[in-house]
């Protein structure tokens, strides 16, 4: 009786490894990284978009204002992070599709392409803002640009926080690209 059972098990062959669980886990990790990137990029855009400070000198009539929309690099930063955050929100259904159907390769190719584009957009926005913040903190004596962060401390600190959140979003996006690339590479025979 024992030989008959073992013979029938050999005829069926070995059971395939549970590949679906591993790919589903990668899909869940992809979804969580997207949520973190959404939080980072949208909080960066909102923080920079609400950054302003007013200083009063001598009387109420002399006021100096620092606002994000006075600098085109900060406007670009807000727009770039809003675009990336919007893309990430729109990519969530595709990420959910990768959890439900872990073998869907075409959606991975779509995500890896657009995630790479969003890395570039987010990095360029953050780099532009960092350049302005450097001049705001250090100044430039050759061009007579004075450091304003000693006076507008709250403005600069809020802008630095926004740029830090944006660079965190860049890191999450890079991790998403690497995750999608490794998933696609594992699909090859």
From Swiss-Prot:
Please report which protein family the annotation says this sequence is part of: Belongs to the Casparian strip membrane proteins (CASP) family.
Describe the protein's quaternary organization and the partners it interacts with. Answer: Homodimer and heterodimers.
Record has Oxidoreductase as a keyword: no
Q: Name one Pfam family in it.
A: CASP_dom
Is RNA-binding set as a keyword in this record? no
Q: Which residues lie on this side of the membrane: Extracellular?
A: 47-73, 130-158
Q: Which GO terms describe its cellular component?
A: plasma membrane
Q: Which residues are glycosylated?
A: 52
- InterPro entries with a match to the protein in the record: CASP/CASPL, CASP_dom, CASPL
Coiled-coil-forming residues are none
Name the UniProt key words of this record, in alphabetical order: Cell membrane, Cell wall biogenesis/degradation, Glycoprotein, Membrane, Transmembrane, Transmembrane helix
Q: How does it sit in the membrane?
A: Multi-pass membrane protein
Report the superkingdom from the record. Eukaryota
This chain's protein is named: Casparian strip membrane protein 1
Q: Which organism is it from?
A: Picea glauca
| PANTHER family tied to this protein | CASP-LIKE PROTEIN, CASP-LIKE PROTEIN 1U1
Q: Which classification does the entry list for the species?
A: Eukaryota, Viridiplantae, Streptophyta, Embryophyta, Tracheophyta
Subcellular localization is given as:
Cell membrane
Q: Which GO terms describe its biological process?
A: cell wall organization
Biological function: Regulates membrane-cell wall junctions and localized cell wall deposition. Required for establishment of the Casparian strip membrane domain (CSD) and the subsequent formation of Casparian strips, a cell wall modification of the root endodermis that determines an apoplastic barrier between the intraorganismal apoplasm and the extraorganismal apoplasm and prevents lateral diffusion.
Q: Which residues lie on this side of the membrane: Cytoplasmic?
A: 1-25, 95-108, 180-189
The record lists the membrane-crossing segments as 26-46, 74-94, 109-129, 159-179
């Amino acid at each position: 009786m024992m030989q008959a059972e073992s013979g029938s098990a050999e005829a069926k062959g070995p059971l395939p490894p549970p590949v679906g669980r591993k790919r589903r886990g990668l899909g869940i990790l992809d979804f969580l990284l997207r949520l973190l990137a959404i939080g980072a990029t949208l909080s960066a855009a909102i923080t920079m978009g609400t950054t302003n400070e007013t200083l009063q000198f001598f009387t109420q009539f002399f006021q100096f204002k620092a606002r994000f929309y006075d600098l085109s690099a900060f406007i670009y930063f807000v727009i770039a992070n809003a675009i990336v955050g919007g893309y990430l929100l729109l990519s969530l259904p595709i990420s959910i599709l990768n959890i439900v159907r872990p073998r869907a390769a075409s959606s991975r190719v779509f995500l890896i392409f657009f995630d790479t584009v969003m890395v570039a957009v987010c990095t360029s926005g953050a780099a532009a803002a960092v350049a302005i913040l450097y001049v705001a903190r250090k100044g430039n004596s050759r061009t007579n640009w004075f450091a304003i962060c000693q006076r507008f401390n709250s403005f600069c600190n809020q802008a630095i926080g926004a740029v830090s959140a944006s660079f965190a979003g860049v890191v999450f996006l890079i991790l998403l690209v690497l995750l999608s690339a490794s998933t696609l590479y594992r699909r090859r025979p």
